[in-house]
């Protein structure tokens, strides 16, 4: 499907789901700002895009810091073009049971996920409104429905869904849609670290997860990228305020 070349920003795209989304949007014909906390860590994703003939820019920014976000978005606008696709993917985990969870554990997760999505969305919306076109895709999680040891993460990921629906109401009349993707178990460095923390080999951890998933496999970053590509497309202009669980079966 041919569509206009847009400028996309994908936060947390040095690796994992974000990297897959950035590469997919580039293959869709968009210029992609590969944004992560450490600019040098973005090199792998940028190289993958440019070696495939795409256009990408590495951008180092802390999504939880207002000045950092403002500077990053202005840099993208000047070097790649006005951003009209935003994927709020940056995320961290600081898992612990409630009685062991520190205030720092809580704040760190809230800041990256929710404050980050707020600051990024607020910074790019003016470019979208000017273009009369915008696509915001927020990464939620099946953990939004509750997950032991993730009071902070599940609250943040549920918050992303409410934030998404409000953006849909506020920005719809300007040609801007906002949707959320809630991944289930996806094979990434983050889930590998979870396996290590609970004392399982990653292969056993994945097998246990797959046994509970109707399609009988764990997800890949590309599964999320496929859905993000759809939400970012021109053809998805009548889809807004939705949460899609990309989890191999029904979740909500």
Language model feature labels by segment:
Residues 97-98, 105-107, 136, 205, ...:
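Substrate-binding pocket helix/loop in short-chain dehydrogenase/reductase
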Residues 101, 146-155, 166:
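Active-site loop-to-helix junction immediately N-terminal to the catalytic Tyr of the SDR YXXXK motif
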Residues 121, 156, 164:
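Active-site helix of classical SDR
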């Amino acid at each position: 499907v041919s569509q206009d070349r847009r400028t996309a920003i994908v936060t947390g795209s040095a690796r994992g789901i974000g990297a897959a989304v950035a590469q997919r949007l580039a293959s869709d014909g968009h210029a992609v700002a590969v944004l992560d906390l450490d600019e040098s860590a973005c090199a792998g994703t940028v190289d993958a895009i440019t070696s495939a003939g795409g256009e990408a820019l590495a951008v180092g920014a802390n999504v939880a810091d207002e000045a950092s976000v403002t500077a990053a978005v202005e840099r993208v606008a000047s070097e790649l073009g006005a951003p009209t696709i935003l994927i709020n993917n940056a995320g961290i985990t600081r898992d612990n049971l409630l009685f062991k969870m520190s205030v720092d554990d809580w704040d760190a997760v809230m800041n990256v996920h929710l404050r980050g999505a707020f600051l990024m969305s607020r910074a790019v919306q003016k470019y979208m409104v000017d273009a009369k076109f915008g696509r915001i895709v927020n990464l939620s999680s099946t953990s939004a429905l509750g997950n032991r040891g993730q009071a902070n993460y599940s609250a943040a990921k549920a918050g992303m869904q409410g934030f998404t629906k409000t953006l849909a109401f506020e920005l719809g009349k300007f040609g801007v849609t906002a949707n959320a993707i809630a991944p289930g178990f996806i094979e990434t460095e983050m889930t590998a670290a979870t396996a290590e923390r609970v004392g399982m080999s990653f292969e056993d951890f994945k097998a246990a997860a797959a046994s509970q998933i109707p399609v009988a496999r764990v997800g890949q970053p590309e599964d999320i990228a496929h859905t993000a590509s759809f939400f970012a497309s021109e053809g998805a202009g009548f889809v807004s305020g939705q949460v899609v669980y990309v989890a191999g079966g029904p979740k909500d």
